Amino acid sequence: MATPMIAGAAVAAAAVAGRYGILAWQAFKARPRVPRMRRFYEGGFQSSMTRREAALILGVRESVVADKVKEAHRRVMVANHPDAGGSHYLASKINEAKDMMLGKSNNSGSAF
């Protein structure tokens, strides 16, 4: 006598769970698309800075104009300035990247 009641309750619970599962899936598929976070370069620094590495550090393309390089340099330096708790090493690499992109430096002038 109790077995049919337990079986009925189990079927009802499965039906309710299935219904809410389907509703949750439909809500998930209908959600607005949120842009994903931008992926950053995960590698380390090269022994001699190249134009490609400088562009990766500043977050610009290799064929960018000088104004965009200066804007990117300012944005990255604000986030990594030593006076705001950033690293002196990173600040020197950011400055070196700006010089490389602007054509002021051919070889690595970094002390690190």
UniProtKB/Swiss-Prot annotation:
Q: Which UniProt keywords apply?
A: Acetylation, Membrane, Mitochondrion, Mitochondrion inner membrane, Transmembrane, Transmembrane helix
- Broad class of the protein's primary localization: mitochondrion
Entry's transmembrane regions? 6-28
According to the lineage, what is the superkingdom? Eukaryota
Task: Cite the SUPFAM superfamilies for this sequence.
Answer: Chaperone J-domain
The protein's topology relative to the membrane is: Single-pass membrane protein
| N-acetylalanine: residues bearing it | A2
Q: Does the keyword Mitochondrion apply?
A: yes
Annotated compartments = Mitochondrion; Mitochondrion inner membrane
S-S pairs = none
Which Gene3D superfamilies does this entry report, sorted A to Z? Answer: DnaJ domain
Q: Enumerate the spans annotated as J domain.
A: 53-112
Single GO cellular component term: mitochondrial inner membrane
Work out whether the entry's keyword set contains Disulfide bond.
Answer: no
Family indicated by similarity: Belongs to the TIM14 family.
Subunit and partners: Probable component of the PAM complex at least composed of a mitochondrial HSP70 protein, TIMM44 and TIMM14. The complex interacts with the TIMM23 component of the TIM17:23 complex.
So what does this one do?
Answer: Component of the PAM complex, a complex required for the translocation of transit peptide-containing proteins from the inner membrane into the mitochondrial matrix in an ATP-dependent manner.
Q: What is this protein called?
A: Mitochondrial import inner membrane translocase subunit TIM14-3
Q: Which organism is it from?
A: Arabidopsis thaliana (Mouse-ear cress)
